[in-house]
Curated annotation (Swiss-Prot):
This is Alkaline phosphatase PhoD. Keywords: Disulfide bond, Hydrolase, Metal-binding, Phosphoprotein, Signal, Zinc. Its EC number is 3.1.3.1. Zn(2+) 1 binds at D68, T107, D363, H364. It comes from Zymomonas mobilis subsp. mobilis (strain ATCC 31821 / ZM4 / CP4). Its cofactor is Zn(2+). Zn(2+) 2 binds at D318, H322, H508.
Length: 576
């Protein structure tokens, strides 16, 4: 089989697991946490006459898939190489250039957008981490998917939906009909939480060495999850050396970065017990997929008397992108695994026997390591100047203003994004330091723009097409006056905000289009597909799915709009 689907690192242990999960044997197992309608006979819900004429109507199961860091650039590069699941999806409705319109192109803000229909300014999820000076603990840095009241140590946080301000599609489905079930599965807790929302029935994410759930979800672990965790425990006792797919030979080229580290030649090998490297191997996404397809059958999703929602976030593309960049053999091998995993999900949905709609997109884009990009003609590709770090700037300003060096003047996670002034300083001093910091940062050759919170507060909310938004408007879409920093710093294009490549060599998070643009693909069997190259927004996904489910939205209730998925004179959107 000469395709991306075929690559020899798909181990026998997973093949047997996949068979065990998707066959009907699991459907005979009784678990305590099942829905009252789980015993509904499979296939009893027949397609209505309306469904027969309009494949988008009568949906019993919505499946929303996010591929972490799957940029429009990656989609463009590999869409002609896909031979399986990703190729099949391209028979659907394809938006190759959808925009995360906001500036903070990180995992948590991006996932908060996908199924809420709102920009981060409304969801409240302005970054993966920010500073909340109202929390009682000493460390004021908070994680987007934690409840800080439950832990004094942010390194030992309790995953929670606490910070998400708005409802998700799943929350709206549950409000419309409490019998709807919301199941969320992901490699990252923040992805599962932000896509699932406030009312998940089942939520599973990778944590340390197994798939786990939220502390307040007390039901019995499904057989599917238990089986996958047992499989992980067994195969992690052995070394693994994945074999690179033959189609990736043209991407294999050695690149030396950092302290003589070599990347680009082959997918990562893993030693027994190395759970960190596990996240950049095919096993990471494959086990997440195994849980998703297993729960489709075990919970009989779509077979109740109300539509169900399954959200899936595949996190390995992001892990590979951070560790190796986007243009080496590592990412090519990862794309092969993605193609296979999507094929398995589609096969499970087809076997499930109920009408479904699948949407695939991403939480943000990404860019390659600057060292390789520069070799390939991107002359502006570079790493950030260490002098732009908040600590370095604090020291310089402390000298200028004759302030103590015992505490930082500014707090920030990295040079780009939100910067917070030290709240213990006098008000007049804070105002002077904010203006001084803005001036110094703005004059740095790697900085594109610096906005104060006051400036962003007074900027009108943008309404034009997202590719036309200026930097201030992009920052505005990520700005929450109660959570955002006193300064928002945007670096120039192709400046990687990692000064020294160690474990992370590449990243995202900028306001530039390579981080903002992602594909959106809507797919349902037997529907006429089309491609629309004109830009749309990721906030448009939720209103489009809500329309298919006939869940009404008031004008202006969300930032997104319904996308018409029917290429004929008929429409899948509410008639005005």
């Amino acid at each position: 089989m000469n395709s991306l689907l075929h690559h020899s690192f798909l181990k026998t242990v997973f093949s047997s697991l996949a068979i065990a999960i998707v066959t009907s044997s699991l459907s005979s197992v009784t678990i305590a946490a099942t829905h009252p309608l789980d015993n509904h006979p499979k296939g009893e819900i027949a397609a209505s006459s309306e469904t027969a004429h309009n494949p988008w109507s009568g949906t019993r199961l919505i499946v929303a898939i996010s591929v972490d860091q799957f940029s429009s650039d990656l989609f463009s590069e590999y869409r002609g190489r896909f031979r399986s699941g990703m190729k099949q999806l391209q028979n659907g409705v394809v938006y190759p250039m959808a925009y995360h319109s906001h500036a903070a192109t990180e995992t948590c803000p991006g996932h908060s957008v996908l199924l809420t229909g709102d920009h981060p300014a409304r969801t409240g999820i302005i970054a993966n981490n920010w500073y909340d000076f109202s929390v009682k603990r000493a460390d004021k840095k908070v994680y987007c998917s934690e409840d800080p009241s439950l832990s004094a140590d942010p390194q030992n946080y309790q995953p929670s939906v606490h910070y998400l301000k708005v409802p998700t599609l799943g929350d709206r489905m549950k409000k419309a009909n409490p019998h709807s079930r919301v199941i969320s599965v992901a490699g990252k807790d923040r992805a599962a939480i932000m896509m699932g929302g406030h009312m998940t029935d089942q939520i599973w994410f990778w944590s340390d060495n197994a798939y786990k759930t939220l502390a307040d979800h007390k039901g019995e672990m499904p057989v599917t999850v238990k089986t996958v965790n047992e499989q992980v425990t067994r195969f992690m006792q052995q070394d693994e050396a994945p074999v690179m797919p033959s189609v990736c030979a043209d991407h294999a080229s050695a690149l030396k970065i950092g302290n003589n580290r070599i990347i680009g030649l082959a997918p990562a090998s893993r030693k027994a017990g190395d759970f960190k490297t596990f996240r950049v191997t095919p096993d990471y996404d494959r086990t997440t997929t195994d849980i998703a397809i297993g729960l489709i059958d075990e919970l009989k999703l779509g077979h109740g008397n109300a539509p169900d929602l399954l959200t899936v976030s595949l996190s390995a593309t992001d892990a590979v992108g951070h560790a190796y960049g986007t243009e080496g053999a590592e990412m090519c091998s990862q794309m092969a695994g993605l193609d296979d995993n999507i094929a398995r999900i589609i096969a499970a949905l087809d076997s499930n026997g109920v009408p479904y709609v699948l949407v695939l997109t991403a939480d943000h884009g990404g860019q390659d390591v600057p060292e390789r990009a520069k070799l390939r003609g991107v002359e502006t590709a570079q790493r950030v100047d260490p002098a732009l770090s908040p600590d370095q700037l604090s020291l310089r300003l402390a000298e200028r203003f004759q302030l103590s060096h015992n505490q930082p003047l500014f707090f920030a996670n990295e040079p780009q994004g939100d910067w917070y002034i030290n709240r213990n300083l006098p008000e007049q001093t804070k105002a002077q330091l904010i203006q001084a910091a803005k001036s110094e940062l703005s004059n740095h050759p790697q900085v594109a723009a610096v906005f104060t919170a006051s400036e962003l507060t007074h900027i009108p909310y943008p309404t034009r097409s997202p590719e036309l938004w200026n930097l201030a408007e992009r920052a505005k879409a990520s700005f929450d006056p109660l959570r955002s920093g006193d300064l928002i710093v945007l670096l120039k294009p192709r400046v990687t905000p990692i000064a020294k490549p160690v474990s992370y060599v590449a990243t995202h998070g900028s306001a530039w289009d390579y981080d903002r643009r992602v594909p959106i693909i809507f797919y349902t069997p037997h529907a006429s597909g089309f491609e629309q190259p004109m830009p749309v927004e990721t906030v448009d996904i939720m209103p489009s799915l809500a329309a298919l489910l006939q869940i009404p939205l008031r004008k202006g209730e969300v930032d997104g709009r319904c996308l018409d998925l029917d290429p004929t004179e008929a429409t899948t959107c509410p008639v005005k």
